[in-house]
Structure formats: structure tokens, C-alpha cells
Amino acid sequence: MGTARFLRAVLLLSVLLMVTFPALLSAEHHDGRVDICRLPSDSGDCLRFFEVWYFDGTTCTKFVYGGYGGNDNRFPTEKACMKRCAKA
């Protein structure tokens, strides 16, 4: 039983890495800097409730941020999000 549980955990971790890793790579510039506008929305680790904005690749979209953690694709207003991420 322990081996089956271990294999399921390894499989789950593999799937999570396959989904997450390409998204992080596509957010990286050629010089290694991360383009925050290409990062996925990330609500963070806490359970507080802040309505903030992230750039979804096309436009700025509202989401709920928990108050701690997450990534830098998070803006206090739609205007700030568009100013940073929208291409002219």
C-alpha cells in the first residue's frame, strides 16, 4: 500500500511540474529577467480578501489575493495593470 501511495504522489508532482514549468519559462526574457505580465495569477498563501488585478496575456482581470506570497503579476488597480503590461 505504501508503494502505491508513493507512486501516486510522484505522478501528481510530475503533472504539476509539467503544467507549471513551461509557464515559468515563457515568462522569462532572454537575459534571464522574468516578465511579470506573463506570470499566471497567484492568490498567495493567506486567506485574506483583496481584490486586485493581473494581466492575463490580453487584458487586465480582477482576482482575489490572499495577502501574502503570490507573484508580481498583481496590481492594485486596472489602470496600474494596463500601464505596466498592455502593449501600445
From Swiss-Prot:
Any matching Pfam family: Kunitz_BPTI
Name under which the protein is recorded: Kunitz-type U15-theraphotoxin-Hhn1c
Any single biological process term in GO: envenomation resulting in negative regulation of voltage-gated potassium channel activity in another organism
Transmembrane segments: none
Tissues in which the protein is found: Expressed by the venom gland.
Residue intervals of the BPTI/Kunitz inhibitor domain: 37-85
Entry keyword annotation includes Calcium: no
Propeptide: 28-33
Site (May bind Kv1): L39
CDD domains: Kunitz_huwentoxin (cd22598)
InterPro entries referenced in this protein's UniProt entry, alphabetically: Kunitz_BPTI (IPR002223), Kunitz_BPTI_sf (IPR036880), TFPI/VKTCI-like (IPR050098)
Disulfide bonds: C37-C85, C60-C81
Subcellular location: Secreted
Molecular function GO terms recorded: potassium channel regulator activity; serine-type endopeptidase inhibitor activity; toxin activity
Cytoplasm is among the record's keywords: no
Site (Reactive bond for chymotrypsin): L47, R48
